[in-house]
Amino acid sequence: MTFYNEFFKRLQRLMPSNVKPKFESDQDLLAWNQEQGRLSSESILRENKAMKMQRVLGRSGIRELYMNCSFENYKIEHDGQRKVLKAAKRYAEEFNENIASFIFSGRPGTGKNHLASAIGNYLILHGKSILIVTVADLMSNMKGTFSGTSNITEENLLHNLSSVDLLMIDEIGMQTESRYEKVIINQIVDRRSSSKRSTGMLSNLDHRGMKNLLGERVIDRMRLGNSLWLTFEWDSYRQYVRGDEY
């Protein structure tokens, strides 16, 4: 405390009389410094979690095509796209206020990945840790933990997947529908909802298809909080994507 007391006194002597100091006492200065240290530590911890998971899962995360996706460069041609854009943007802006998850379902090439990446990019800019992973990559890395040369266990991987602020699982329904895959997805959703962390899912399946694939238990947990289910029903516009739009 002596350091802060002496520092504060010197600061007061050097400061012009017409300038009001930000801190009224050395205790205020100490409290501010401790708070900044806490915020910095939390930020580093979040970044380390995301980096650790991206190292483990290799080519996961926001892919190059979607790295510059935002709400601003999402193309709107009709009311359906306007509706999903508004809802996705609101979800990102209100992320801190609830534990809601989301499901984007519908036809391929309709903008599900764009808006999911826009949510991810928005949250990264606001200090959150996010991870996008396909089911294929997820299961490949899960099965890789059984290898005798793996330096991470299945439990370690499940724990890390449950620790990022937002986990988005892509290509739900393109897998082989094995029992192990259902068990793993169920465990991930269960752990994340129990720890009040949100999960996003992207799929070409409709509501009935998702329920049949994952089971009522998983779908029910995805409804926690002010959850979001958006349906992308229009034609694909991938044929018009050049790669330099974003």
UniProtKB/Swiss-Prot annotation:
Record note on quaternary structure: The helix loader is a DnaB(6):DnaC(6) complex with a crack opening large enough to allow ssDNA into the central cavity.
Alphabetized GO MF terms: ATP binding; DNA binding; hydrolase activity
Function: Required to load the replicative helix DnaB onto single-stranded (ss)DNA, to initiate chromosomal replication. DnaC alters the inter-domain and inter-subunit interactions of DnaB, inducing an open ring conformation that allows ssDNA to access the interior of the DnaB(6):DnaC(6) ring. Has ATPase activity only in the presence of DnaB and ssDNA. ssDNA binds to the central pore in the DnaB(6):DnaC(6) complex, making contacts with both subunits.
The protein, known as: Replicative helicase loader DnaC
NCBIfam families in the cross-refs: PRK07952.1
GO cellular component terms given for this protein: primosome complex
Enzyme Commission number, as recorded: 3.6.4.-
Key words of the record: ATP-binding, DNA replication, DNA-binding, Hydrolase, Nucleotide-binding, Primosome
Family assignment from sequence similarity: Belongs to the DnaC family.
Site (Probably involved in the interaction with the DnaB protein): C69
Gene: dnaC
Reaction catalyzed: ATP + H2O = ADP + phosphate + H(+)
Keyword Lyase in record: no
Source organism of this protein record: Buchnera aphidicola subsp. Schizaphis graminum (strain Sg)
Keyword match Thylakoid: no
Highest taxon in the source lineage: Bacteria
Lineage, uppermost ranks: Bacteria, Pseudomonadati, Pseudomonadota, Gammaproteobacteria, Enterobacterales
UniProt-listed GO biological process terms: DNA replication, synthesis of primer
